[in-house]
Amino acid sequence: MIDFHSPQLSDEKWIKEKILQMKFPTCEYSFGNIFSYTAIMDIMVAECFGCLVTKCTFRDGFVEYCFPAGNGDTVSALAEIVTDGIRNGIPFGIFGMNKENAEILSRHHSDIFDIHYERDMCDYIYLSEDLKNLKGKKYQPKRNHISYFEKNFNWTYEKISEDNIPECIEMAEKWLELSQHEDKEPLEQELEIICRAFKYYDRLGYKGGLLRLDGRVVAFTMGESLSDDVFCVHFEKAYTDIRGAYQMINRQFVTNELSSYKYVNREDDTGSENLRKAKLSYYPAFLADKYEATYINEDNTKC
């Protein structure tokens, strides 16, 4: 039986140790995300056979487990996940798998899981130098937006700190209010996550930056290190009616805060056509492929 518990700040050290043992951790394997997403779902963690196991229960009751992370006994940890999922008697799946992970699951449990590639959840991985320099013809539109911003606005950039976090939260709330999205529930949930992340900003080791126009915060971004080489951007907000704000905060943040990282992980697009177009327009070095698995019950139907 897996001894799950709610993630606490005291779990940070051992969880990060397990994450650092991975070849290339993706956004699911981030202590900041695990801790902050408890604002909108029931997340539990445990050490099982030397691996990190994460269990997420969504508001609709569906349960997903992260593939075991770390250098422990992955096969035994997987067996415990399967036992836990079946024992609960509710629909469940396993997510956050790379190709190697999916092959391990298939080798040991192919008879009870539908395993599939999940393009909507692939992380976009960029070279930090590309995001900083924006060289070449393909980045000309980005440079044009930035040039307009620099020439037409009285702007400043600064690091996010305890002093300006309240202004960032106020800006995020205003951004949501102005949003034209028909279904605002996902954005409202995101705001809950952002607020929790800011509440523990320093303790979680986040890095962030913001833009001001005439003293007013109009954009911010924040994230955390996944490894010595990879920084993961969790959130990025800018007012859409201010031309160049998104392009500017992206470039300023990478230039000022992320020069020591080789890669910048800007997470997935969740299947959003507009978000996918925006992420592809920055020409990722590669996509971190992901696979998901859904448990198939005894009558051969997906749960």
PLM-predicted stretches and their roles:
Residues 110-184:
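Acyltransferase donor/substrate-recognition loop-hinge adjacent to the catalytic core
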Residues 1-55, 298-303:
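Non-cleavable N-terminal signal-anchor transmembrane helices
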Residues 206-296:
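Aromatic (often tryptophan-rich) hydrophobic motifs at membrane interfaces
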Residues 28-100, 212-242:
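Conserved donor-binding loop and adjoining core beta-sheet/short helix segment
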Residues 93-94, 158, 263-266:
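Short catalytic-loop micro-motif centered on adjacent basic/acidic residues
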Residues 163, 167-216:
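Short, conserved active-site entrance elements at the starts or edges of catalytic domains
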Residues 101-115, 144, 271-287:
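Conserved active-site alpha-helix within GNAT-family acetyltransferase domains
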Residues 91-108, 119-122:
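Short, glycine/charge-rich beta-strand/loop segments that flank catalytic centers
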